[in-house]
Amino acid sequence: MDSHEVLLAATYLLGTLAAFCLGQSGRGGLDIQVMLSGSNSKCQGQVEIQMENKWKTVCSSSWRLSQDHSKNAQQASAVCKQLRCGDPLALGPFPSLNRPQNQVFCQGSPWSISNCNNTSSQDQCLPLSLICLEPQRTTPPPTTTPPTTVPEPTAPPRLQLVPGHEGLRCTGVVEFYNGSWGGTILYKAKDRPLGLGNLICKSLQCGSFLTHLSGTEAAGTPAPAELRDPRPLPIRWEAPNGSCVSLQQCFQKTTAQEGGQALTVICSDFQPKVQSRLVGGSSVCEGIAEVRQRSQWEALCDSSAARGRGRWEELCREQQCGDLISFHTVDADKTSPGFLCAQEKLSQCYHLQKKKHCNKRVFVTCQDPNPAGLAPGTVASIILTLVLLVVLLAMCGPLVYKKLVKKFRQKKQRQWIGPTGVNQNMSFHRSHTATVRSQVENPTASHVDNEYSQPPRNSHLSAYPALEGALHRSSTQPDNSSDSDYDLQVAQRL
């Protein structure tokens, strides 16, 4: 082998040795398993190495590390890269990370575990800790954000009343909601659309529209505390079209207004209604008309709105009486207080005006469906009359009965007495002498029309001598062959 070949072989060996040495230093301890513990991040914590299938902490005095944490950090770049973290920041002991576990002490080059020994529990050595930068999070490039649009409301439109005037039901400030957008409605005094008011009251199931309230009337008497809690929303709607037929057509959005006046309505079904009664008459259906406000009863003063019969007919129905009979005004004391209703009917009176001097009252008379019965004195008189009638019948009844029977028998005796056959032309007449004598002896019988009805009582002369003789003979010798009670043959012989 010549010198040239020897030189080439030596160069090759030196290159191989240099490559080996550079490879070892470049890997910088990547041949060991390292992890960081004791924190919530994988990029900071106590250094633990895997030896003998166990994870062990490393004493901070190992590998002759300096006290400068930042200088030591340069030697831990390979470890941070292996942990997929950023650049190293500090390497050394940290009092906050002091949890040794199977701790070892290593010598030699940094991150070499060829010369590591277990330490005793008596050795006071803080574990070695490492802090690396957190890995950078890769975020996708920003995309163009579409413009935000407010979706159209899907809930059906609705109305709501915030109680205002004296806390009455079906009265108050009107709020309109369309989806999630809600608010009160701007009210303009020049606009008084009756159709819109009826639509609002009908939608709220409160009957028909009565009136709008101005700001002063809407304030009125304050409502109870429990009803004043809900405050009306600000004005966000207006009603440009008063002749609309649906809620969505009636209202349109407007800018929020704090100083404007909100729409306030009173519907016919407001509650509670005015209570009324009639006092001072003979029954509950007659008397002076009185009304009640809260717990106070006062007379209802006469007003121009009550000139017709409508108010008083309604009052009669309210008292469960019949039809209205009459009504008239009655003078009252000048100091007598009362209430005044400005509406035509009491059912429309949402507010009663207090008056200190009620000069004219109204006396109303309604038909009483349940009139009073008979007085006790009248009933007693009727009973006494019936008792007397029964006693009278008991005393006089038999006498009257006897007289009636006797009169009936006398009528049966008034019959013709004379011949009944064809050839029997003989008749019996009272003699004139007997008749005159009987009238003289019995003057009371002269007025009798039928001279046969009452025979003479005090006369010794018979009025019918032939007849009496025949009767006497026939009674002694009865003849059954004759149909008559008188023996006519004997009478003919006489």
UniProtKB/Swiss-Prot annotation:
Q: Which residues are glycosylated?
A: N117, N118, N178, N241
> Which sequence ranges are listed under topological domain Cytoplasmic?
402-494
Protein's cellular compartments: Cell membrane
Q: Name one GO biological process term.
A: T cell costimulation
All copies of the SRCR domain together span 34-133, 159-268, 276-367
Keywords, in A-Z order: Cell membrane, Disulfide bond, Glycoprotein, Membrane, Phosphoprotein, Receptor, Repeat, Signal, Transmembrane, Transmembrane helix
> Disordered: where is this region?
439-494
Q: Which GO terms describe its cellular component?
A: external side of plasma membrane; plasma membrane
Q: Where are the transmembrane segments?
A: 372-401
PROSITE patterns documented for this protein: SRCR_2 (PS50287)
Q: How does it sit in the membrane?
A: Single-pass type I membrane protein
The question of whether Acyltransferase is a record keyword is answered with no
Knockout mutant characteristics: Induced Cd5 deficiency compromises gut barrier integrity accompanied with reduced expression of several anti-bacterial peptides and mucus components in gut epithelial cells. The frequency of peripherally-induced regulatory T-cells is decreased while the propensity of T-cells to secrete IL-17A is increased due to a STAT3 activation.
The PTM Phosphotyrosine maps to Y452, Y486
Q: Which residues lie on this side of the membrane: Extracellular?
A: 25-371
Tell me which residues bear Phosphoserine: S438, S459, S482, S484
Explain the post-translational modification: Phosphorylated on serine, threonine and tyrosine residues following TCR stimulation. Phosphorylated by LCK on Tyr-452 and Tyr-486 upon TCR engagement.
Give start-end of the signal peptide: 1-23
User: Compositionally biased, Polar residues: which spans?
Assistant: 439-461, 473-483
The UniProt subunit note reads as follows: Interacts with CD72/LYB-2. Interacts with PTPN6/SHP-1. Interacts with CBL. Interacts with CD5L.
Q: What does this protein do?
A: Lymphoid-specific receptor expressed by all T-cells and in a subset of B-cells known as B1a cells. Plays a role in the regulation of TCR and BCR signaling, thymocyte selection, T-cell effector differentiation and immune tolerance. Acts by interacting with several ligands expressed on B-cells such as CD5L or CD72 and thereby plays an important role in contact-mediated, T-dependent B-cell activation and in the maintenance of regulatory T and B-cell homeostasis.
Q: What is this protein called?
A: T-cell surface glycoprotein CD5
Q: What is the organism lineage in this UniProt record?
A: Eukaryota, Metazoa, Chordata, Craniata, Vertebrata
